[in-house]
């Protein structure tokens, strides 16, 4: 007991701790700075990447020491209260994965264009109304998630993201799929659910590598025939729309495999649409029955 009291008394007299007031709990990076240690000691060195994480720290600003951690390749600043991403982020040119989801960001600095090694960028759950055209200069980007923001358009230059494979634009304000998206030939995952879409452009057929396409919970009125030409599709989710008819060519999507009811399952998701008769009964009967009906209808 005496030893513990002695330590507590010593801490109370520490001028560095007194400067921080009565705060009882210190994060690892607070303690490192208080003790005068090199912040690089906080870096986690894995087999493939050097990573650094400041998740759920309640931060409104990013600590300046971070911009000196030039080795960092995976940076996780998610679930804080950040309102600004400073231009200094451009110094971290080795970053491969950057997670900024769950903050209060309204914009991104143009200096993101300097992150030439960036492959994965998470911007989910922020307040972004636009993204800078300079982001398209990150030509190695493969995964871009911007769900739950306030976006209604993308820069035309995004067509230059030729290596992009996965794009999540769900829960935004898009009235149509941006034209630049149809230039992303390597795209195998596209999520545009919970937007304001009324149709799917014929250009969807340009996405020949697409395996997963989610457009649930929109106001889509028709199922375009051109979508039937994307024969690589393994999961197609059009739940909760206003679709009344299905194209006769739907049977061309042979990789769908089945009518799916679980959101995570591969297959055709077409529930909660005002399908005209006899389509609801055919859907209930399974994909084989539905395809057989559509084939006969097309050839008779």
Swiss-Prot record:
Q: Signal peptide location in the record?
A: none
Q: Which SMART domains match?
A: LRR_TYP (SM00369)
Tell whether Repeat is among the UniProt keywords: yes
User: Looking at the Swiss-Prot or TrEMBL record, what is one Pfam family this protein matches?
Assistant: LRR_8
Q: Which domain of life is it from?
A: Eukaryota
From the UniProt record, list the LRR repeat ranges.
Answer: 47-69, 70-92, 94-115, 116-138, 139-161, 162-184, 186-207, 209-230, 231-253, 261-286
Under the heading PROSITE patterns, the entry gives: LRR
Q: Which UniProt keywords apply?
A: Leucine-rich repeat, Repeat
For this protein, the record's PANTHER family field holds: LEUCINE-RICH REPEAT SERINE/THREONINE-PROTEIN KINASE 1, LEUCINE-RICH REPEAT SERINE_THREONINE-PROTEIN KINASE 1
- Protein name, as recorded: Leucine-rich repeat-containing protein 30
């Amino acid at each position: 007991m005496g030893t513990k009291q002695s330590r507590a008394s010593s801490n109370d007299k520490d001028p560095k701790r007194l400067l921080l007031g009565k705060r009882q709990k210190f994060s690892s990076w607070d303690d490192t700075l208080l003790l005068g240690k090199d912040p690089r000691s906080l870096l986690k060195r894995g087999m493939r990447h050097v990573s650094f994480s400041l998740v759920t720290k309640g931060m409104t600003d990013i600590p300046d020491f971070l911009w000196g951690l030039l080795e960092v390749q995976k940076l996780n600043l998610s679930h804080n209260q950040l309102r600004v991403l400073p231009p200094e982020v451009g110094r971290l040119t080795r970053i491969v994965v950057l997670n900024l989801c769950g903050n209060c960001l309204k914009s991104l600095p143009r200096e993101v264009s300097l992150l030439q090694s960036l492959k994965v960028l998470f911007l989910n759950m922020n307040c972004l109304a636009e993204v800078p055209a300079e982001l398209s200069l990150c030509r190695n980007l493969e995964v871009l998630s911007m769900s739950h923001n306030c976006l209604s358009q993308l820069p035309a230059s995004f067509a230059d993201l030729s290596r992009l494979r996965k794009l999540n634009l769900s829960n935004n304000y898009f009235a149509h799929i941006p034209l630049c998206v149809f230039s992303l030939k390597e795209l195998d995952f596209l999520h545009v659910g919970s937007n304001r879409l009324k149709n799917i452009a014929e250009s969807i057929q340009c996405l020949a590598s697409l395996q997963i396409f989610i457009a649930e919970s929109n106001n889509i009125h028709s199922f375009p025939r051109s979508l039937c030409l994307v024969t690589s599709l393994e999961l197609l989710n059009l739940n909760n729309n206003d679709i009344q008819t299905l194209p006769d060519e739907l049977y061309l999507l042979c990789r769908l495999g089945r009518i799916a009811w679980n959101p995570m399952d591969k297959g055709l998701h077409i529930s909660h649409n005002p399908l005209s008769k006899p389509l609801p009964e055919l859907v209930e009967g399974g994909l084989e029955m539905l395809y057989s009906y559509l084939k006969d209808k097309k050839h008779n």
